[in-house]
Design a protein with these regions (language model features):
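Alpha-helical transmembrane segments used as membrane anchors
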Residues: 1-189
Length: 189
């Protein structure tokens, strides 16, 4: 049996590693150059313009080809998970919750890729978005598939990022009310 100290230290180490790895992948994605020799792009040129080097060129090419612009969502999910592990103690954390978060992150990624594929051109959703959206559109039509994807996107984002929509709306409402009263008192004075 692993003690709580060792387990927490291991989780913190993995979280910091995930943040550093996500930062490297972010640099590789931002400096992506389609002319770099990479995983899906074989060229005779040996010149690599990606700031992540040959590994960054391969990783960014793979992510952009498969997931499109949703590659940045993968990084966001990883960073949010790492920050929540480091800074917030979840009293309801369990193996089933971790599995649900993984599955909901995957559903969120698929839905986001498909919506990007519909709204933006040039393969913005990657191969995954194209395949899923074309098959859903054939089965449900364009509007039906968009409704289906949004219905999955909303709860998947809540489960993946570990937040409550009700608490978020409540906080937003209290901010609006306090802003309204401050504006009213300012205008009346």
């Amino acid at each position: 049996m692993i003690s709580n100290y060792v387990r927490n230290t291991l989780f913190n180490f993995l979280s910091f590693f995930l943040i550093a790895f996500s930062l490297y992948i972010f640099i590789a994605l931002v400096s992506y150059d389609s002319s770099d020799p990479a995983f899906f792009n074989k060229t005779s040129s040996l010149n690599i313009n990606n700031l992540g080097g040959p590994l960054g060129a391969n990783v960014s090419d793979f992510l952009f080809t498969i997931f499109g612009q949703a590659s940045f969502l993968i990084l966001l999910i990883g960073i949010v998970w790492a920050l929540q592990t480091i800074f917030f103690k979840d009293q309801y954390n369990s193996r089933i919750k971790i599995i649900i978060r993984f599955v909901s992150s995957f559903i969120l990624l698929i839905s986001f890729c498909s919506i990007l594929e519909y709204y933006f051109a040039n393969n913005s959703g990657g191969y995954l978005g194209k395949i899923v959206f074309i098959n859903l559109s054939n089965a449900l039509g364009f509007i039906g598939s968009l409704v289906f994807l949004v219905i999955f996107l909303i709860p998947a984002s809540s489960l993946s990022f570990n937040f409550s929509w009700l608490k978020t709306v409540e906080i937003f409402g209290s901010i609006l009310i306090s802003f309204f009263f401050k504006t009213k008192s300012f205008l009346l004075s």
